[in-house]
């Protein structure tokens, strides 16, 4: 009768390396998503400022409908961009985790 020694440290080390690199991947992806989110947020604000500058009516005591609409559209875009980036990150993290464990 022969006995075979199974070394479980190799599989444990490889599994821990997979987890390490997966966590590292999630951190890097979160940083990239955050940078793209910040850039898009400031780009929306810059477009808003440019639009408000060109659509300024010249009257200081009246607010035009275009200015009010610009404020609402900008607020909507800022909220939409935030929800889109957070939602995309959460969904992609779930998909990647399921793919890793499957």
Curated annotation (Swiss-Prot):
For this UniProt record, the keywords arranged alphabetically read as follows: Membrane, Transmembrane, Transmembrane helix
Q: Where are the transmembrane segments?
A: 8-28, 31-51, 71-91
How does this chain sit within the bilayer? Multi-pass membrane protein
Q: Where in the cell is it found?
A: Membrane
A GO cellular component annotation here is: membrane
Q: What is its main location?
A: membrane
Name by which UniProt lists this protein: Uncharacterized protein L813
List the taxonomic lineage.
Answer: Viruses, Varidnaviria, Bamfordvirae, Nucleocytoviricota, Megaviricetes
